[in-house]
Each structure stands twice: as C-alpha cells, then as structure tokens.
Amino acid sequence: MGRYSVSPVPKCLLLMFLGWSGLKYYQVNAAQLREYRIAAQLEDWDYNPQPEELSRLSESELTFKKIVYREYELDFKQEKPRDELSGLLGPTLRGEVGDILIIYFKNFATQPVSIHPQSAVYNKWSEGSSYSDGTSDVERLDDAVPPGQSFKYVWNITAEIGPKKADPPCLTYAYYSHVNMVRDFNSGLIGALLICKEGSLNANGAQKFFNREYVLMFSVFDESKNWYRKPSLQYTINGFANGTLPDVQACAYDHISWHLIGMSSSPEIFSVHFNGQTLEQNHYKVSTINLVGGASVTANMSVSRTGKWLISSLVAKHLQAGMYGYLNIKDCGHPNTLTRKLSFRELRRIMNWEYFIAAEEITWDYAPEIPSSVDRRYKAQYLDNFSNFIGKKYKKAVFRQYEDGNFTKPTYAIWPKERGILGPVIKAKVRDTVTIVFKNLASRPYSIYVHGVSVSKDAEGAIYPSDPKENITHGKAVEPGQVYTYKWTVLDTDEPTVKDSECITKLYHSAVDMTRDIASGLIGPLLVCKLKALSVKGVQNKADVEQHAVFAVFDENKSWYLEDNIKKYCSNPSSVKKDDPKFYKSNVMYTLNGYASDRTEVLGFHQSEVVQWHLTSVGTVDEIVPVHLSGHTFLSKGKHQDILNLFPMSGESATVTMDNLGTWLLSSWGSCEMSNGMRLRFLDANYDDEDEGNEEEEEDDGDIFADIFSPPEVVKKKEEVPVNFVPDPESDALAKELGLLDDEDNPEQSRSEQTEDDEEQLMIASVLGLRSFKGSVAEEELKHTALALEEDAHASDPRIDSNSARNSDDIAGRYLRTINRRNKRRYYIAAEEVLWDYSPIGKSQVRSLPAKTTFKKAIFRSYLDDTFQTPSTGGEYEKHLGILGPIIRAEVDDVIEVQFRNLASRPYSLHAHGLLYEKSSEGRSYDDNSPELFKKDDAIMPNGTYTYVWQVPPRSGPTDNTEKCKSWAYYSGVNPEKDIHSGLIGPILICQKGMIDKYNRTIDIREFVLFFMVFDEEKSWYFPKSDKSTCEEKLIGVQSSHHTFPAINGIPYQLQGLMMYKDENVHWHLLNMGGPKDIHVVNFHGQTFTEEGREDNQLGVLPLLPGTFASIKMKPSKIGTWLLETEVGENQERGMQALFTVIDKDCKLPMGLASGIIQDSQISASGHVEYWEPKLARLNNTGMFNAWSIIKKEHEHPWIQIDLQRQVVITGIQTQGTVQLLKHSYTVEYFVTYSKDGQNWITFKGRHSETQMHFEGNSDGTTVKENHIDPPIIARYIRLHPTKFYNTPTFRIELLGCEVEGCSVPLGMESGAIKNSEITASSYKKTWWSSWEPFLARLNLEGGTNAWQPEVNNKDQWLQIDLQHLTKITSIITQGATSMTTAMYVKTFSIHYTDDNSTWKPYLDVRTSMEKVFTGNINSDGHVKHFFKPPILSRFIRIIPKTWNQYIALRIELFGCEVF
C-alpha cells in the first residue's frame, strides 16, 4: 500500500512519477537532457576468454556469476550494442556543464542494488546510497532498488562541479552501487562517468578535441566477496585478465584521451604504464600514471611510433597476475602534426649523446659499513647470515659505463660508493639523440628499456608476457657476449611541460623479464630535460647540485642468481627451504641506491645550495614509498612538502634549499624495513671562505675535481652539432663569474670555440659537495679542497656555545630577530595515558566492530599554563578532533614555543612536519653527530618537561592568496610507527598573516581536521604481548582484524561535530600518517571541492596517501546530512566513515517561544520569584508579569530551561529584560548549557579560550539583544545561566534555529515570495466593506481583514497553494484571526496534495493508514506547528478545515525546500 495514496501504488513508481513531473521545470535551463536506460543484470563472466577450440575446462571452472550494468533501448527489452573493450564496465555516462543526466534504472538482478555517482549534484532521492541521513522512507527508495523494480535518478552537472580552467575537457569519475560497497563492486557493478566542460562533446557524446578516447579500469576482483561467492582473486583491465583485453586501437599521430579508473575493495595501488609512450596528466609529463583503488585520473597521449605496445600496471604482483593488455598503433596515413618547427638558435642546442654500457655480474654488499645505531632486529633479519640466511652479500648484475666501444676501460676505476648499485645517469634534452651501445658481459640475456621517451620497436628492449620465442628480437634480449645499439630521439611530445621541473626523473632497466632482471640489480636513472635545461657537459643549469636517490626493493628470491647465492653464502645450502617465510623475508632488501642500512659517510651540501633531487622507486614493492626529508622541505609541483610519495617504477623531481644547519635524514616513512633500509644522512653546513685558498690553489682544486668527479655521462661526440650555451637569468651571476655570458652575446661562438676550462669551471660550480653521481672522495683529498667536511658540523655554527645550557627563549628570540618580527605563540601540551573506546554510540547496530573496542592509549592534551594542572577543555570547535592532539596554529614568520610535559609511563617526544627547527627541537633520534646538548629533545622521560621551538618560514604556509591555511602534523618521534598507533598525533595549521586571533583560533573560517588512519593496536606500546599475532602470521602477511580499527580521528562511524552552513567556504585539513599500505580515497557525498592553492583543478574524490597533509576547500551546495567516507570499501565498511550536516544559511527561525508554539509545560527553571514564572519568559510578552525572574542567592546558580521536545539546530538566542513600574530588570551576562537527553549537559564554549563563553546580555529592560551561536549546536534542552544582572536576573527569550534534517525554511507565505495568484480557495467571503480572499492567508498578516475565510463554513472548503514546482514540504504553522471581537480559528484540519492539480491524495496517518486529522489552534492569534513525517513531495497542497471556532479563518506558513 503506498504511503501517500489511497490506491495501492508501489513506492518506487510513485517516486518515479513525482520525479518525472518535477523535471519539466528545469528543461529550459539545461544545455541538454541526456537520458540513459541502465539495467543491473546477471552475467556469467570469463576473465580469460579463449576461443572455443582452445578451451578444455568446464564452464563452471571458467566463469563467475556477476552483476553488471548494461545499457538498454527505450523499453528495456533490447540491450544496446557495446564496445567489446568495455568488458565488465557499465556504459560510460557523459555530461557537459549545464546538462541534466537522467538515468532510468531497472534491477534485473537478485540483490537490491543502486547507482551512486562520485561527482554530480543530486538530491537525497537520487543519491543511490544508504545510510542514516534522517530522510524519510520515500526519499530512501533510491538507496537500494529491489529486484524487479525500477527507479529514475536525476543528476545535475553544474558549473560548480564541472572541470575548472586548468582541468582537461572531461574529468573521470566512477559510478557504482552503494548498497554494500564491498560486495557490489566485487560483483561487477561499476561504470565510468565523464563530466565535461561546456561545448566539449559532439552530438554523439564523443569529445571534440581528441581523435580517440578510452576508458580503462585497472581492478582487483575478490570473488570470495562477490554476492555469489567463489574463491578467486582476479587482476584485470576492464575485467580481462592475462592479456585477454581486446587490443586498444590507434593511428600514428592520434591524440588520445585516457580515462583511467582504479578499483579494489581493499587498499590497492596501480602504476599504469604504456610501453614506448609518454603521457600528460594535470599539465605534467609522465611515463607512469599513479592510480589508487577508488580514484580516477584523466590523461592524454599523442602517439607516433607504430607497433603493438604493452599496457600494464608495473606493480610486480600485477604483472605476474596478468594485468596487462596492448595498444596497437597503426600507420593510417595521417600527417605528422606533433613535431613543431625550431628556430635556428634552438636547432643549435640539439646534441647527440653516446653511452657505452655493459651488464656485468658482481658481488654486491648491501651494507659495507654497518653503523652501531642500526636496529639489532633488523640487522639479524636482513644483514647477518646466521640461521642459514644469505646475509648482506649477493651475486648481482649491474649496469656499468665504459669509455668506448672496446668495453675495456670503465669510466670509474673504482666503483663510486655514492652511486651505489645504480647504472650511469643518462640525460637528454628534447630533440637530442641518445645512442646506447650495450654489451652483455653477464651470463644470461639482458636488455635496456627506458621510461619517459617515445621509442621505436627496435629501441624498446622489452619482452612482453605473450611474446613467442620466435618474435624475440636481438634488441629485446641481448645474449651473453653480444652487443646491441639502442638509439632514440627525445620527441617534442616527450618534453617536460611548463609546470615540470627543468629535468624530470625517469629510469631504465633490463626488461627481458622485468621482475627478475630488476631483482638482479639492473637499474639506472634517466633524466629528460627541457631544451635549455642542460649545459654542453650535461649539467643542469638551474640547480647548484643534482642528487639521485633510488628507493629500490630487491627481492633476491626472484633474482636470477638465487641458487648461486644460496650455495655461496648459506652455511648449509642443502637444508635451505626457499618457501620458508622467514628465509623469504630475509632476502627482500629495502635499499636506497642499493644500500640496506645507513652509511658511516655523510652526504655533504653547502649552506644555501639549491639541490635538485631525483627520487625514484624501483623493484618488487607493491607499496607506496613515502620519502621523508627532515629539517627541510621538497618543492615539487609547486608545493612545499616534507614527504613525497613514490609509486612503484616512477620518479619525482624536487628542489631542496639547504637552509638549516646540521646533519639530517632522508628516509622512507613507513614500515620498519623501509625506515631502516631506505635512509641516508646528509649534512647542511657552512664552509668558511678563508679556507678556500688563493686563486692558484683553486685552479689546482679544479683539476682534482675534474679528475675525480668526471660524470658518468661524459658526452662522446659523434656528430659535430653547433651548440650555444645560454645561461638562464637565474644563473646569470654564476655565468658571469665564470665568464660564460659571451656565448649569448656573440652568437658566432660555437661549442668548438669554448675552452675546456670553462666547462670544467661550470662542472665544479654545479657539483659542490659530495654527490652520488661523481664518485667518492678520499678524506685526505677533501682536506685540500674548498669542500672539506668538518667532522662536527656544529663546530662552525655560531648559534652554539657548548659551555652554556640550552635556553628556549634565546632560540625563539634569535628567530624573532632574524625575521624582524615579534610574534611568539606558546602552547602547553602533555602526553597522557587514557582508555580509548573505538565503539560508536550505536555499537550494537554495527556488526563489523570486534568484540573488544577499548584499549589503553596515549594522547596529546592541551593545558592552560606551565603548571600542567588545568587542562584546556575542548569546545564545539574541538568536538570533531577525537583522538587528535590540540591544533597548533601559527601564522607565517611566527615562532612556536611548545612546552611539553610527559605524563605517560614511557619516553615520548614532539616532532613537527613542515616547520624549521634546530637540532635541539627535532624530536627524533638518529645518528646525527649532534652534541649531547642537542639530543635532549629526542626522548622526554616520564614526568620530564622540555620546550620545543619551531620557526614558521614562508614555505611552511599558504603558497598564494587563495589559500587560507596549510596543514602539517606533529607526533611523538621516539618510534614514530608505535607512537602514532599508540595515539600520539596532532595537527599543525599554518595560516596567512592576520588570520589567527589572540586565542590561537582562525578568524571567520569554518575548518575541520580529519585524520584517516587504520589503527593497529598490535603496533601500540600498550598492547599485551600475549594477544599479538604470531611471528609466522606476521611473516606471511596475516593481519588480525580483531585489533585493527579503520577510523576518522580515531572514531569509527560516528565522528561528531561536523556542521556547516550552505554556501559558506569550508576548509578541510586531511591527514594520513599511516604506513605504506594505508591508502584512503576521501569522498564527500553530495559535494565537490578543490585543493587549497590549486583552485583551478576540480576534485570529486581525493586520494590521501601515506604522509599526506592536504587542505581542501568546499562550498556545500546541498543542505542535509551527508556521508563522508573512504572509497576503499573494506575500510569504509569497518568504520572509516562519518556524517556531516549542511544547514541552511537561513537557519535562524524563531523556534516558538514568542508565538506560543513552545508550550508552557516545556519551560522550566531552577526557581522563580513571586509570579514571574518560567512560562512567561517569551520574547515581547506583555502584561504586568511578563518574564521569568529570580532572586539570586549566594552560592546559587539559577537557570531557565527550554525543552524543545526534539533535537534541533540552535544558531542564536534573543533576550529581553522587563520593566515594572519604571523599574528595569535584566540580565547583563549569561552562559549557555545544552543537552540531548536532559542528563548529560555541555557548556557552550564557542571561540572562547576559557571553559565557557559568556554572552553579552541586555542593557535595559525592553531592548532585544541577539547573540549568534557559532558553531551551531544540536540539542533538545537549552539552559540559560545568568551570571551578571541589573536588579534581578530576568529573561524574556526566543531561540533561533531550524530542524536537524534541514529543509525547514519558510516557503514564502509570510514573506510574499508565494504570489497572490498562486493562492486559491474553494470560495471566499465578501462583504460590502471587505473581502477575505485566499491571498490574505499569510502568517502574522495584520489589518482588519487579515486572513482567508470561505463564503460558507462547511467541510467542503479548502485553501490551496501552488508552489510552482516539485517541493519537499516538512511542516506547517496555522493561525486564526479576529473580526471585530469574534475569535475565529480552525480547530482541526486535514491535508491533501497533488503534483498535477488533478489527482488529489490525502496525507495519511502512518499508524492507521487513514487520512490524518491535525489539531489546529486554540485561539485566534497563537501559532500551532505540525511536522510532516514523512514529508510531502508535491507541487500543490490543500488545507481542508474539519472543525472550527465560530467561523473558518486561516493564516498559514509552509516550511520545506526545493527538491532540485
């Protein structure tokens, strides 16, 4: 039986009908109505389709039962033809800005399913997602469409969510079923949604600006979590595994738009690579697309090289599992439109580079020097060869450079230590030609494959998984002893973009068997540079120094030489069990440049040098490698950050300015193996000019450097090409000093006319310090150069007086003097141990939480002063922080002083990201050669106190005026992994100047901090050892979910305090400090957002990677309660979700004290004096006794309370005193408490720094004083507590606010927004002196004739309002009227409604399914309010009087909101 209709109409059909009618009011404004008919249907799917004659397995073994989206013709009887390439994917939905997408959906499957878009503007009945959002049953019909039923979804593509200026023409999103994210996805319910700029699509929906467009979904399907369970894990592209994806077709010189989706119900990363091609993504040139499960990217590619090219994810397990396909580029006779013409000057810059590289077998020592500080467990597991382990020495193959084609004289006589295991650096500019003569001096076939440049098939050097042996050419696999020449030119389409660094970081490796070749050691760095980026020597012009850091995971179990290593290094080779988890793990080496532990030598840099870091992740790792730089920040892609995330087989270029003296650490953030193995120390030091010697000595030193530091990329000139060296403006000073500006001033000067000395001087100037690419330097030699490293870097630091104690005020003062500004912000923070309960309020309703949810943890807590006696109680602004420590706020150029007290039972510290600090305020422990004075910050003992001093340089703050604040984090750094899992972490917000008040709060900004983390209690210091997983379980990767809690701010499911106004700017600061596998994709339902400082790029979801601090800006456009979640289904299902509420900006309606809607029985007080009872405390009340008043006695704390009988949003309070016999009584100051249940009371704090906010009251007995409640509060009970008063505490009150569910604003009867012509009636009363017409039925209308009266008084009369379009009506207020002395009002009434002004339906009583009769007024002037639960969804509404007093008379207001 339909809830709103007398006749039995299915709910879904009713809602469909209402929705279709509502659309007609929006067709005029839409660029286009795009209609799709989509069904969810069962399908038997074969991940490995084979020709019938090749199949020998039964159908049940080959196929899996799936639910998929398919597009149909109008009547849902004929499925539309689809591209074979789309596979499991549903049809691609497209819409331009201004369009309306209408999806007619039918469920042919056996499970309730839905359609939910990652980005679109939709109302609650087109969301397609089920959660507790306070909506009615009729609004939840979209959440889960039952089998056999239909539904129509309506999505608006507005300018607010469309692509921004810097975005590509179309942005890529996904749509999917959101009934059960894990099971729905693994069953196959997913498709692509393209949201495009206006005018970017053809009539057929294809993009105008590309020759071709393709959607590829890289996904992992866990069939055991399908609705139709069948154990299997499938690694696929568009649902095709093992290379069975139909070939993607293209023509040479095509411009292709790629829409790439990553999907998995568990955390997953993909490194998408197109062999032999380059792509452009977000205006950056890439060779690998970094993709995470739950997110999508848009990229484009221009192709020129014909052939069949591999498409794959370079994550090792993906390749092994068959996640690949092919791009087939044909010569279709199209002209070359990709090569631009160069000027004569540009042509002269073109160079030929020739390298002679061999593959050689060596014995590699992963840790030639093991510092005493190395973790003993790590050392025993990876570096010792006890327990029949191999240890730290392995036979490997490496790339080595030779001087010529004879391959007899290496460029290095002694292997340079700093270069490590890496092959020589290959560099080239756009249009340069690179020739690599490769000789295989190893014992098995190898090759060279380069990333980041377009190559021909002859120069590819890669064997594909499906290559038959007869197709393996000489270049793909060079046999032992053979020589092959690879030759390629850097094309215009390979050139770094304007936004890119001068040189972008790529790599090369052997690709006969990529996984095993890399595991064997054959890797090297490659730099692709802009036309003006390199000197004739191959040195980058805009960097003082270049430094390579390759974070490589070598899985020696997959090396070609495993058997050799077992025989040589294991004490008992015959007893080795290669499948033993402990043995296997001991052979997986986490390295930086091939070293698996810290080295005793320290990398040296000169103070103020600009270092160009080239960072790469290589190897069998299936995790992100987060690279952390201490004491400094990377400048990468226009953003300062101190953690860069490297995806497998990808690289990043970043600039680091050496501006902080001391020995610092570059290391991987994350697992124990990564942080111990992937690390190196570097020195940022001053070198005294007086030690540099005279001019002759400098020349001698230059000769030494020329000999020792000759780069591996020495150019072997094959053709004489005229080249000019043109310094960039930023290098003019250096160029003038070296006498190199004559080249530009005298164009006739050719390369042959330059002196060798000029080139040597430029080389030396660019490689000051000890660098990885130029070999090691003997200590004795360094003593005779200008670069001699001092054994104690702090000895030359003028800030240090070893004879005096450290004084934090002195440090702060020095910072303040340096920046010529005196603004110091003090914080008092303690580490305390607490019992933390992960269970939400409604734990019994959550099935996925473990039985035990309460654990001992340590948290940061704020105190008011250095006595640490009075905690700073959190207020409404801190309510959402959960487990997070207090927010540390500062402005650019401030100095932060944090006094830290350790009230816990074990050592902790404070370590800050993104800020500038001396070694004595780092809060981390490693071998940094610091004096003892500088090590006291490393670990503060229990009950100890220490003051950390941090400076806020400009790089720590917002990068432009559009960005308000930038987020970082602080945590205990004694053992970061264990400390954070124990709970010790908090946010840092650095804001523009003038944005923080004296209480350290931001001014006029709505901001929230969200910390996404899977807390693993087994990694906490406080977890009982007896409950931990066994060593065997850990070694094989078994993780018990009983002790892990995916949460936001440490609270699964029900984080509180996320409330904001519609259309206000909301700033979200998102943190992720989890390990390498902690990948979260943040989705705000119903809203889109931009990243702070990058407002030119639109986001629908945000991948939040390990060590990421992201600040985003949102302008909520839809009121209501919405879901905030991770798109990683398994984490979402287990609690990484929360609700946020968007309230109307007009949420300041009187709640009913003045009007009488709030009854006398709802108002109470602690007491009253004489006849001044609580029920009289109504704003503007009149009479002799017209307010509440009380005589305050000593030690008494009076209050007055209003029970609103439901939870509402309170946004303001109006107060008034009273006057009796010319005597004024009023409250001067008061505070507010509130409660949801009448038992647990909260004192409103707002922005006040103390425990409560004191509101300014009245200054006389008659004036109304209004106070704003910000942030808004949700409560049922409100109490006002007078603290200061005149004569006696006295109140007349009105509360301002709205309903929690939203959609409760007046629709326009009282204001006149509803026109007179839109109000009609069955009849109206006319007299010779007045007419009681329908349009007079407006609430609170004044005058002698101020209401609607019908001509006759009977039950056939009605008042009708036409709202002009489909509207959600949530409540009504009725009022009577007075004529002469006659009180007229309606005592009872019913409601009818319709959407077509024809078929009227009565509003039914939910309990009886009969027409509901509402109780009306009891007098002619008072208000009575009724709520429609469920709400009415209609255009027309009628009020039908049933009984009345004297005569029918009505004044009304309707409340609700528009549906669209």
Swiss-Prot record:
Expressed by the venom gland. Residues 1-30 form the signal peptide. Residues 693-817 are annotated as: B. One of its GO terms (biological process) is venom-mediated blood coagulation. In contrast to blood coagulation factors that circulate as inactive zymogen in plasma, venom prothrombin activators are always found in the active form in the venom. Hence, catalytic and non-catalytic subunits are found naturally in venom as stable complexes. GO terms for molecular function: copper ion binding; peptidase activator activity; signaling receptor activity; toxin activity. In physiological conditions, blood coagulation factor V and factor Va are inactivated by activated protein C (APC) through proteolytic degradation of the heavy chain. However, omicarin-C non-catalytic subunit (factor V-like protein) retains its full activity even at high concentration of APC. This has two explanations: this protein has only one of the three cleavage sites present in factor V that are targeted by the APC for inactivation, and the binding with the catalytic subunit protect the cleavage site from inactivation. Pfam families: Cu-oxidase_3, F5_F8_type_C. One of its GO terms (cellular component) is protein-containing complex. This is Venom prothrombin activator omicarin-C non-catalytic subunit. Ca(2+) 2 binds at residues 919, 934, 937-938. Residues 772-817 form a propeptide. Disulfide bonds join 170-196, 251-332, 503-529, 672-1031, 965-991, 1147-1298, 1303-1457. Keywords: Blood coagulation cascade activating toxin, Calcium, Disulfide bond, Glycoprotein, Hemostasis impairing toxin, Metal-binding, Prothrombin activator, Repeat, Secreted, Signal, Toxin. Residues 32-196, 206-330, 351-529, 539-685, 823-991, 1000-1143 form the Plastocyanin-like domain. It comes from Oxyuranus microlepidotus (Inland taipan). Heterodimer of a light and a heavy chains; non-disulfide-linked. The interaction between the two chains is calcium-dependent. Found in its active form associated with omicarin-C catalytic subunit (AC Q58L95). Residues 740-760 are annotated as: Disordered. The lineage of its organism: Eukaryota, Metazoa, Chordata, Craniata, Vertebrata. Glycans are attached at residues 156, 242, 300, 385, 406, 471, 557, 943, 1000, 1180, 1397. PANTHER family: COAGULATION FACTOR V, F5/8 TYPE C DOMAIN-CONTAINING PROTEIN. Belongs to the multicopper oxidase family. Ca(2+) 1 binds at residues 124, 139, 142-143. SMART domains: FA58C (SM00231). Residues 32-330, 350-685, 823-1143 form the F5/8 type A domain. The record marks 771-772, 817-818 as: Cleavage. Residues 1147-1298, 1303-1457 form the F5/8 type C domain.
